[in-house]
Amino acid sequence: MKTKGVIILLLSLMGVATVGRSQKLIEYTSGMGSRNPQRPAVWILYQDVVATHEGMTLYADSAHYDTERNSFTAFRDIVIKLSDTTTIYGDQLYYDGNTRVIDIWADTVVLIDGGNVLKANHLTYERNTSTAYYDEWGHGTSADRTLDSRKGQYNSAIKVFYIYDDVQLSDSTMRLVTDTLVYTTDDQIAHFRSATHIYSDSSLIYSELGDYNTDTRFASSYHASHVENQGHMIDSDTLYYDEVAEYGKAYGNVKIKDTDNDITCSGRYGETHRKLRYSYVTDSAHVLFVDAGDSLFLHGDTVYLTTDTANRLSTVRANYHVKVYRRDAQAMCDSAFYNATDSILTLYKDPVVWYEHYQCTSDTIELHHDTSGVKIVYLRTNCYAVEQVDLNKFNQLKGRQGVVYFRGGEPLYADILSNAQMVYYITDEGPDGSPQLVGANVGVGTDMRIYFDTTHAASRVVTYDKPDMQTYPVMELPQDMQRLPDFRWLAARRPRSPEDVFKW
């Protein structure tokens, strides 16, 4: 593509350098002829006029040949044979034998060059550069494709259209609209350098710099790249997209958006395969979910999305260094999996969930959602819940498993199941009316239930099956009883904003 552009430029420069080089006179034959009485240097020719000049043969009904200027003016049924493959048809012509420039007019001037055709009302053809020009609408065809523009050029030496102003390239499968286009007919590739839209039955491609292979339907975009495909959008700096396979690779500022499900997956590199119903993004990858007016940001080293046969979101998977931010809850883990069918988000390998002033950890955490928000949270194996109540004092609940129940997105109560342990501080109203720590309940039991008030604070703890409980004044609680085994306080790693999901 670049080589052909250089060739066009060199041919143009050669044309400038060689203007006026030819002094060979035009030769002609005709059925009848006479000198113009007012201009004896001009011959008026009639009937079967044939003129030749340096490899070109011209046919016309009549003509005027100016021997002083070495120019030829022809009329009606004009045929110009420029080479074995290149022919021009028209109704009126002026040819300068010194500059080798043809100007030809007709209701429709037709240039045929092998399988390429150019039509216009007026063409200027420079023989030195093998280039035809038009400046008032032209219509080209090459194979099964048509090219239309207000102005343009066609180079018959290298078989290239250069067209601009209201450009349209189309065939039975697509329509390309732009302002400036170079179309190399040998490889059927369109090269564009301005805002370009490519429409087809299945997709829309937008680019401001790139190439489009009209035969294979493969697009290469290097600036402001955008593809839309049935509710699926891709934006990036650089994009390679195969329309037939519905497969794309994107580089730089990548955004893959599922408009049907209101999900955007972003990163620095991504791939999407619509026929196989998956996409993935890596390098600063993150997903934005918009639901019920709130947004959830999920980051992982690599994020995968899949859809079902009805183009509905099926799964989201994030691997390594996963963090999640939502206004009312945050999380961290090694990997995460979201099943859209069941609305379940599962966090694996050392997961942490923060909800308001609570921190929950477990081997695996499942968050079940409905239209109102979180419905139930399962803390599977090694459940541990912590709430900070003072600078160095924490409410703690620990057990084999835990379940937190919600209603309308608000927490109701939580069950700590099997081997439940507790450190729970008692508060009372202080002299200034603010809560004051007065004691601590410490104990173990088979199961425990914690109830939450309207402010989401733990208001009551119920123990079952003959628990072993002790109450201490706050200042007398032994140091070794203030922390349950495996205590961790991870507030420093909690994401406080969407940007924090990238901090590990």
Question: Language-model segments: what does each one mean?
Answer:
Residues 1-27:
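Bacterial Sec-dependent N-terminal signal peptides
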Residues 18-504:
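N-terminal amphipathic/hydrophobic interface segments
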